[in-house]
Regions:
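N-terminal flexible/basic segments that precede or flank functional cores
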Residues: 1-17, 69
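Short basic helix-loop element that most often maps to the first helix and adjoining turn
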Residues: 17-36, 61
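Short, conserved catalytic or interaction motifs in soluble domains
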Residues: 49, 74-75
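DNA major-groove recognition helix of helix-turn-helix/homeodomain DNA-binding modules
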Residues: 57-72
Length: 76
């Protein structure tokens, strides 16, 4: 059985990959997303790499910049 830390690491990595895919679909560099979202390019790099436990406020800024919407947590 996997521990909590490895599960969270995998979720951060998957979220980062999703953000990267949306950004590149827009044809944007990381710096462009950072500027539009009002965060640093270093944060974008860390988030996309799955190395940053991003908070909901930053996620909301990124989603807004990408024209996406954050969804509520739903039970499967």
């Amino acid at each position: 059985m996997r521990d909590k830390d490895s599960i969270l690491k995998d979720k951060r990595k998957a979220m980062g990959e999703s953000i990267r895919a949306m950004r590149t679909a827009q044809g944007w560099e990381q710096e462009q997303l950072a500027r539009i979202a009002g965060i640093t390019a270093a944060n974008v790099r860390s988030i996309e790499a799955g190395k940053y436990a991003v908070n909901i406020d930053v996620l909301n800024k990124i989603a807004g910049a990408l024209g996406a919407e954050l969804r509520m947590i739903e039970k499967e």
